[in-house]
């Protein structure tokens, strides 16, 4: 990937110089040393939150996130996007939760990553205290604990 981007950069400047530009006013100022990965992987969750689902209301909603790119609607974060489909006591948080497309762009930022981390940590603590599993703390008890620290789950609560 890095070599390909360097090759493209060299080709771009060859073309510009062939069109008459000179090195006096046309040159790369900075060349990235690392590939810019926004997302490399995500879990296959019990629910994949797609852009088509992002306007839905979910019974297992554990938080809300907004569209920070353009003014837009507030979306619900279902608990199932934090739970890997085939693992019992594992929670995901941050950029690796089960989302895709535009929803990935909306959830990859620090506020949503931090929120999902707090939710996953709270769920793990509740499961440990109750001797339960990740799916076992969905709904009631988890939402009750999150509401205690002022989480909102549905748009009409705003």
Where are the model-predicted features located?
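Flavin (FAD/FMN)-binding glycine-rich loop and adjacent Rossmann-like elements that form
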Residues: 1-158
């Amino acid at each position: 990937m890095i070599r390909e981007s360097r090759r493209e950069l060299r080709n771009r400047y060859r073309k510009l110089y062939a069109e008459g530009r000179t090195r006096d006013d046309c040159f790369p100022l900075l060349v990235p040393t690392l590939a810019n990965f926004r997302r490399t992987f995500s879990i296959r969750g019990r629910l994949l939150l797609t852009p088509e689902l992002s306007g839905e209301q979910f019974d297992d909603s554990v938080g809300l996130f907004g569209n920070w790119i353009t003014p837009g609607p507030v979306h619900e974060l279902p608990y199932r996007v934090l739970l890997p489909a085939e693992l019992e006591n594992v929670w995901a948080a941050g950029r690796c939760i089960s989302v895709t497309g535009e929803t990935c762009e909306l959830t990859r930022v620090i506020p949503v990553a931090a929120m999902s981390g707090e939710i996953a940590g709270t769920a793990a603590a509740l499961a440990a205290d109750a001797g339960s599993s990740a799916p076992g703390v969905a709904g009631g008890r988890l939402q009750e604990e999150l509401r205690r620290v002022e989480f909102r789950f549905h748009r009409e609560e705003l």
